[in-house]
Amino acid sequence: MELSEHFTFGVPGAKFMPSYRGGFWDGKIRLFDTKTNLIYFGLRFELARFAESRGYKFSLFDNSIDITKDDVNDFIKHLKVPLEVRDYQLDAVYHAIKHSRALLVSPTASGKSLMIYCLIRYCTLKQQKTGKKTLLLVPTIQLVSQMFKDFQVYGFDAESNCHMITSGKDKDADKPIYISTWQSVYKMKRDYFAQFNAVFVDEAHLAKAKSLSTIMEKLTDCPYRFGLTGTLDGKETNRLTLSGLFDVPKNVTTTKKLMDSGTIAKLKVNCLVLNHSKEDKKIARIIKTYQEECDYLVLNKSRNLFISKLATTLKGNTLVLFQYVEKHGVPLTEQIRGMTDKEVMYVSGITKSDEREDIREFAEKSDDVIIVASNGTFSTGINIR
């Protein structure tokens, strides 16, 4: 009971969840299973601290392998990647290989896909004698295509070696690497996941979602586990869950370091505060619900006109994100198109994955395109160099 209580936490926002309100769940997450007496391997150091603080005797299993950073560097050079592998990327790949599992925290534009590629090539090399496969999970169908094409850029024959899985696609193929949205495979039975001995989760902070945790728990015979994310939200429950599923977080680099080194452009945020008309303010005062407030904002003609003018006058590629498709995204796109000769591209959930990838590639080759996209399609992991 003492161990169970130590690894039991209240879930933030649980009181708003239907299962809690209905009395089916107490709003807590338990990382130690009292039925099986098992706990996530990634929590071994947390468990050791628990035992040490109470004077309990324990032995800690060392899962690291005998390999040097020079060995890893030689392996990466052998891959002949046509891009520079930076020092922090080498450090991250070495750390992951050394421990056979890792949770790498690295910001946007730090080259996470290159780190994933190097690690996948290492895993496939180790799998040649076993016939096992590698599973790469990403949160969106667009990232499935983007990761596939990134591998091609790195000089890999992705067509022969990678199987892309999205909703409605075949879940099996005679290829060593599967790239899938986690939504496409989470309902598969445990037997399906037995074919993998390496799993990668991009945007791993989403692993706090129950369906993705379920996938990880089905991978019972999977020694290689790697999660990559640009952020951890600071909540103890999420940090421990991610640590358990993968390993103790390793900070690879920071956005500031990337800016200081010139790897990415300096970031400047301009926050624009709009002063609404007296008539609009009167309307706003009688709004009672959050949904009414959202409707007021997205349907406000003056506000939409300001957004459209701003988008058409900015220099360089411009991204306009929206939440509501029919009420906001569609009319906003039409208004912007009517005000400019620039290329205006629209992306929403119904846009096919190959079309989204074509738009992303077009934007990479352009310097004056406007993309109007739903928040769900362009909010996570999209990389336009």
Protein language model regions, located:
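Conserved interdomain hinge at the start of the Helicase C-terminal
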Residues: 285-323, 327-338
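Hydrophobic anchor at the beta1->P-loop junction of P-loop NTPases
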Residues: 104, 136, 320
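Interdomain "pre-motor" coupling segment immediately N-terminal to P-loop NTPase/helicase cores
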Residues: 12-67
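Post-DEXD/H (motif II) to motif III coupling segment of the RecA-like Helicase ATP-binding lobe
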Residues: 205-270
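Conserved helicase ATPase core of P-loop NTP-dependent helicases/translocases
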Residues: 145, 161-173, 319, 330-331, ...
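Conserved pre-motif I regulatory segment
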Residues: 31, 50-53, 59-105
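Conserved helix/coil segment N-terminal to the catalytic DExD/H
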Residues: 167-198, 209-214, 377
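Conserved Walker A/P-loop ATP-binding site and its immediately adjacent core
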Residues: 113-118, 122-124, 128-153, 324-326
